[in-house]
Regions:
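Active-site loop/oxyanion-hole signature of alpha/beta-hydrolase fold enzymes
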Residues: 79-119, 295
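Catalytic active-site module of serine/aspartate enzymes centered on a nucleophile-bearing elbow/loop
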Residues: 271-301
Length: 301
C-alpha cells in the first residue's frame, strides 16, 4: 500500500512540475545517439558556437536563453541538452565524464560538421577539456564559465558513494528522495544561495524551467543525479588541461565560492589561460549579467 501511495505522489509531483511547459520542443531537433536522443536547437548564421549547460539538477539548454539570440547575429549557435537533462533522453546508465566527452565529440562531428568554438558552464567545462584533449581537431576557442575545482574533480567514488548511488536508484523510494531534493523550494533556494549574486534578481521563468527539467522523464531523472552525487562524473583533468594549446578563456563570477582559487589552479596548470571576472555575478553570469557576459564573448571569439 505504501509503495502504491508513494508511486502516486511521485507521479503527481512529476506531472505538476511540467504544467507551465517552459521547455519548448520541436521534434526535428533530435540527434540520435547511441545512449539516447539528444535535444538541441540551432539558430543564426556564421561561425559555429556550441553552448553546453551545467549539470546541476534541472539544468538544460534553457540556461543560455538570455544570450543565444544575440550570439546568433554573428554565429550559428548550437545549444544542447546534455544526455540525462532537459528534453534529452534520461537514460538508465551510470553517467561518467567519458559518456559526455563522447557525446560532445559525436555531436560536433555529426551535427555541426566542422571545428567549433565552445562555451561550457560549470561542471561541463571538465567534459570539454577532456574532449578537446582527445580530439583537438574538433575544437577552436573554448570559454569556461565558473569551471569546477581541479581538486574536486580528483575525488573518486568510494564504498559509501557506491552505496548512496544504489540507494538513490531504488525505484519509487529513490524517486521520492529525489523529488524532495528538487522540490520547488529547493530549486528556489539553489538560485538564491548558489546561482545569483543578487537574490532579488532571480528570474522566476528560469527557476520554472529548472523545476520542469528536473522532473521530465519520471523515475529515470534519478540516474544523472545519483552519478553526480556519487562522484562518478569526476575525472582528473590536470594532464589534459596542461596539454591543451587552444585559446582558453575563463569567465568567473565575482562571488563564486573559491572562484579565485579555482581559476588560479587552472592558470597554474596552463599559463596561457586568460581570466575575466564579472562583477556582481555568481554562478550564472550569463543569466544575471547577459550584456556584460556578451561583451566578454565578443572580445574573445
Amino acid at each position: 500500500g505504501a509503495t502504491v501511495a508513494v508511486h502516486f505522489i511521485n507521479h503527481t509531483i512529476a506531472t505538476a512540475a511540467q504544467l507551465k511547459q517552459m521547455l519548448h520542443i520541436s521534434n526535428d531537433n533530435y540527434f540520435e545517439w547511441r545512449f539516447g536522443n539528444i535535444y538541441y536547437t540551432k539558430k543564426g548564421t556564421g561561425s559555429p558556437i556550441l553552448l553546453i549547460h551545467d549539470t546541476l539538477p534541472g539544468a538544460s539548454g534553457y540556461e543560455w536563453s538570455k544570450i543565444e539570440d544575440e550570439l546568433a547575429i554573428d554565429h550559428t549557435v548550437y545549444t544542447v541538452d546534455l544526455l540525462g537533462c532537459g528534453r534529452s533522453d534520461k537514460s538508465s546508465i551510470t553517467y561518467t565524464n567519458f559518456v559526455y566527452v563522447q557525446m560532445i565529440s559525436d555531436f560536433i562531428k555529426k551535427i555541426i560538421g566542422q571545428k567549433t568554438d565552445v562555451i561550457a558552464s560549470g561542471f561541463s567545462g571538465s567534459f570539454v577539456t577532456m574532449a578537446c584533449h582527445n580530439e583537438k581537431e574538433l575544437f577552436n576557442k573554448i570559454m569556461l564559465v565558473n569551471p569546477p575545482s581541479l581538486t574536486q574533480l580528483k575525488q573518486m567514488p568510494n564504498r559509501k558513494d557506491r552505496l548512496l548511488k544504489a540507494a538513490l536508484e531504488i525505484p519509487i523510494f529513490g524517486t521520492l528522495v529525489y523529488h524532495m531534493i528538487v522540490s520547488r523550494d529547493n530549486i528556489n533556494n539553489l538560485f538564491i544561495e548558489k546561482m545569483y549574486y543578487n537574490p532579488f534578481h532571480v528570474d522566476n521563468q528560469m527557476a520554472d524551467a529548472y523545476y520542469e527539467a528536473a522532473h521530465k522523464g519520471g523515475y529515470y531523472t534519478i540516474f544523472l543525479y545519483s552519478s553526480l552525487a556519487a562522484k562518478y562524473i569526476n575525472i582528473n583533468i590536470c594532464h589534459a588541461l596542461k596539454a591543451l594549446d587552444n585559446s582558453i578563456y575563463i569567465v568567473e563570477g565575482e562571488t563564486e565560492p573559491n572562484g579565485k582559487a579555482v581559476t588560479d589552479d587552472y592558470c597554474a596548470s596552463n599559463p596561457a589561460i586568460e581570466v575575466s571576472v564579472l562583477k556582481e555575478t555568481k554562478h550564472l553570469p550569463h543569466v544575471e549579467a547577459p550584456e556584460a557576459f556578451l561583451e566578454q564573448v565578443k572580445i574573445f571569439f
